[in-house]
Amino acid sequence: MSPATVLDSILEGVRADVAAREALVGMTEIKAAAAAAPPPLDVMAALRQPGIGVIAEVKRASPSAGSLAPITDPAKLARAYEDGGARIISVLTEGRRFQGSLDDLDAVRAAVSIPLLRKDFVVQPYQIHEARAHGADMLLLIVAALDQSALVSMLDRTESLGMTALVEVHTEQEADRALKAGAKVIGVNARDLTTLEVDRDCFARIASGLPSNVIRIAESGVRGTNDLLAYAGAGADAVLVGEGLVKSGDPRAAVADLVTAGTHPSCPKPAR
C-alpha cells in the first residue's frame, strides 16, 4: 500500500536513509563525534537582536517546486548570505526531495561564523547527534512528523547537546503541542506538508496565540521586503527565506534588502 500523504512518503525515505548512514557510522561513534565538535553558537542571542532577523537557506529543490537552483558551491552561497547580513543559515540535508546532504552542512560550517540550522525530517535520535557532529547549532523538529512523546524527547535531546530546536507547526493544534513540549522557538510553515497546499493566513492566525516569550519564525512565502514587513506586522521575530534567495541573481544583495527592511525604524517590532 502506498503512503497516505506526501509527508508519509518523505519520512519513509528518511528512515531508510538514516538506517543506511547508521550502518556505516554507529550511534556510539556519532555521539563521540558530536561531543568532540566545537561548542554550538548562541542561536537565541542571534534571534533576539533588534529588528526582524533573516534566516537564509541553502536549498536546491523542494517537493512542491522541484529543482530551484543547482548550487554547486554551497559554501560560496553561504558566505554571500553572511555578507548580506543573515543571522542564521539554514542548510537542507534531506537528499531525496530537497537534493541536500550533510556534505553541504560541512561545507557551510567551514565557510561561515554565524549559527547554522540543520533542516531535515528528524525522526530518530541518531539525527540529533549527527547534526551536532556536523556543526549544527539549531535543529528543525516538525510536529507533524512526531508523536508527542517523541517530540518531547527529541526536544530535550536537542537542548541537552546545546543546540536550539526550531519547532515547526502548521496548525493551532500543532502549536499547542509545541508549547506543551517546551518549545522556545516556533516556526510556522504556511505549507501543509501532508498535501503541499499553502495557507498564507496561517502565520498570523497561529502567532497571535503564542506567548510573548516564544520566538516566532515565519517559514515560507517570503519573496521580498513586502512579505517580510507583512510577517513582521503579524508578530514575526524572524523570517526563513529559501527559494526567493537561491533564484535571485545576487543572493548577497537579496539578503541585504531583507535585512535593511527588517531593521528599518518603520518595520513593526516583535511583540516580546
Swiss-Prot record:
Gene3D superfamilies in UniProt: Aldolase class I
EC numbers for this chain: 4.1.1.48
Keyword tags: Amino-acid biosynthesis, Aromatic amino acid biosynthesis, Decarboxylase, Lyase, Tryptophan biosynthesis
Catalyzed reactions: 1-(2-carboxyphenylamino)-1-deoxy-D-ribulose 5-phosphate + H(+) = (1S,2R)-1-C-(indol-3-yl)glycerol 3-phosphate + CO2 + H2O
Keyword Lyase: yes
Cell division keyword on record: no
Main EC class the enzyme belongs to: lyase
Annotated GO MF terms: indole-3-glycerol-phosphate synthase activity; phosphoribosylanthranilate isomerase activity
Source domain of life: Bacteria
Pathway assigned in UniProt: Amino-acid biosynthesis; L-tryptophan biosynthesis; L-tryptophan from chorismate: step 4/5
Similarity annotation: Belongs to the TrpC family.
NCBIfam families: PRK00278.1-1, PRK00278.2-4
Protein name: Indole-3-glycerol phosphate synthase
Organism lineage: Bacteria, Bacillati, Actinomycetota, Actinomycetes, Mycobacteriales
